[in-house]
């Protein structure tokens, strides 16, 4: 099972959080690829060089994780990963779109917001299930694209009337997640 996160902000934190929760629940069977480090055996973390590794490195790392009996991979998927075909041919079981803002518009990265959005939204083409922030400025576009491609869409957000899953932040880092639809996974 491969879970990929994209977003201008929050990819690394979300990957760490997800891997930690999954490892607590499932044991040492969760690999991680992030901009900070990589874990291919469920225990050992080594420094990373890119947010998303180059294609050949990525697939080599995935093979190593499988050889190490990893059943899950939680990873960051940057806009550059799609722009430079680093994740070409990589299907995601779950793609998570956190947010988008014009931080990476430049001659070096993306010439326009439209190019940036197009690259980031490729996660929809490559995932089976899209989990998307209901409060993302491009939510309607992303959800429509996913529905047009026949993808399941699950939303999250703090607005209880709009998202499938709602969160409420408490004190000291505590939070509560609720859903009005018990049929959702």
Predicted regions and their residues:
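Beta-strand->loop->alpha-helix junctions that form or flank phosphate-binding loops
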Residues: 147-170
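Phosphate-binding loop of NTP-binding sites
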Residues: 1-130, 134, 138-151
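Nucleotide phosphate-binding/pyrophosphate-handling subdomain across enzymes
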Residues: 88, 171-185
